[in-house]
């Protein structure tokens, strides 16, 4: 898979995928982790619950990729409907070899590309949905996915985005290193104020 070769993270992701399964949104976490950093989340899967929701998957992958020197951030992807409480959280990963961002979904174990095999960022995915252009979803490693459901899921969750302006280890744990960096970047369509 081209994106994994580009990321230099194949072994890391293979091990990650085998050890931490997906916790589906309707179930979500029975006990939310006390520590939302790579070490705390790993311990959580060994002692409390063996599975994660999408946010926790993205936080763990974010910190693992950073430890390998791979620039990335986790992004919350939201629907337009304020009554829809379901959102999705994925990683945006910088691919220096091709000088662009790409979406990597460790929770649903997939990534997106265009018809030429170029990995797509969240913004590019959103534009393609708006313009009716094809998005090809690829399974992460050897996972089996229902991409018909996944396409519909993304169609609703690409309306607006939220991400921390500054990210790093233990970002979600009120790490003192981030005390002066508590701003979020919120990208919304013109005329929409979010919720």
Where on the chain are the PLM-derived regions?
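Secondary-structure boundary elements
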Residues: 1-52
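Bimodal feature
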Residues: 1-5, 11, 62, 87, ...
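A structural signal for well-ordered alpha-helical segments within the folded catalytic domains
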Residues: 10, 52-59, 63
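Short His-Asn-centered micro-motif
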Residues: 50-54, 75-77
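Hydrophobic/aromatic-rich core segments of domains that either
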Residues: 59-133
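Low-complexity, Gly/Ser/Thr/Pro-rich intrinsically disordered linker/tail segments
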Residues: 128-195
């Amino acid at each position: 898979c081209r994106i994994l070769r580009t990321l230099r993270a194949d072994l890391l992701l293979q091990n990650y995928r085998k050890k931490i399964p997906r916790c589906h949104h309707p179930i979500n976490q029975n006990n939310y982790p006390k520590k939302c950093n790579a070490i705390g989340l790993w311990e959580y899967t060994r002692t409390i619950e063996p599975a994660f929701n999408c946010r926790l998957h993205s936080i763990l992958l974010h910190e693992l990729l950073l430890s390998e020197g791979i620039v990335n951030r986790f992004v919350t992807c939201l629907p337009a409907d304020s009554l829809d409480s379901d959102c999705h959280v994925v990683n945006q990963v910088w691919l220096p070899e091709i000088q662009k961002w790409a979406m990597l979904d460790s929770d649903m174990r997939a990534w997106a590309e265009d018809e030429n095999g170029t990995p797509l960022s969240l913004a590019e995915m959103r534009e393609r949905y708006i313009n009716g252009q094809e998005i090809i979803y690829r399974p992460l490693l050897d996972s089996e996915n229902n991409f018909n459901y996944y396409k519909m899921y993304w169609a609703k969750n690409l309306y607006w985005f939220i991400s921390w302006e500054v990210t790093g280890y233990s970002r979600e744990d009120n790490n003192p290193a981030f005390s002066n960096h508590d701003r979020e970047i919120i990208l919304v369509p013109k005329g929409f104020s979010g919720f």
